[in-house]
Amino acid sequence: MSDIEARVKKIIAEQLGVEEGQVTSEKAFVADLGADSLDTVELVMALEDEFGIEIPDEDAEKITTVQNAIDYANTHQKA
């Protein structure tokens, strides 16, 4: 597991109040991990803080799974 993947999974577990072991790449935030719309907004904000990035609303709407979040962080994190 990459450092970014581990950081993303840790943030998701903390934000959604689930065990890190439940946070696997294919899980959807709402359907699988019980997130609501406020949770997803807070999750995006936590990812922005962790990786020093800004996630526009149109991109945030597409981040619906753990893998989406990992891919976005990998692609957009500041060096």
From Swiss-Prot:
All copies of the Carrier domain together span: 2-77
* Pathway membership: Lipid metabolism; fatty acid biosynthesis
Matching entries from SUPFAM superfamilies are given as: ACP-like
One GO term under biological process is: lipid A biosynthetic process
Provide the positions where the record notes the PTM O-(pantetheine 4'-phosphoryl)serine.
37
**Keyword annotations for this protein?**
Cytoplasm, Fatty acid biosynthesis, Fatty acid metabolism, Lipid biosynthesis, Lipid metabolism, Phosphopantetheine, Phosphoprotein
- Entry's Pfam families? PP-binding
Localized where? Cytoplasm
Superkingdom of the source?
Bacteria
The entry's comment on post-translational modification says: 4'-phosphopantetheine is transferred from CoA to a specific serine of apo-ACP by AcpS. This modification is essential for activity because fatty acids are bound in thioester linkage to the sulfhydryl of the prosthetic group.
Q: Name one GO molecular function term.
A: acyl carrier activity
Cellular-component GO terms for this entry = cytosol; membrane
| Family, similarity comment | Belongs to the acyl carrier protein (ACP) family.
Q: What does this protein do?
A: Carrier of the growing fatty acid chain in fatty acid biosynthesis.
Q: What is this protein called?
A: Acyl carrier protein
Recorded source organism is Polaromonas sp. (strain JS666 / ATCC BAA-500)
User: Taxonomy-wise, where does this protein's organism fall, top ranks first?
Assistant: Bacteria, Pseudomonadati, Pseudomonadota, Betaproteobacteria, Burkholderiales
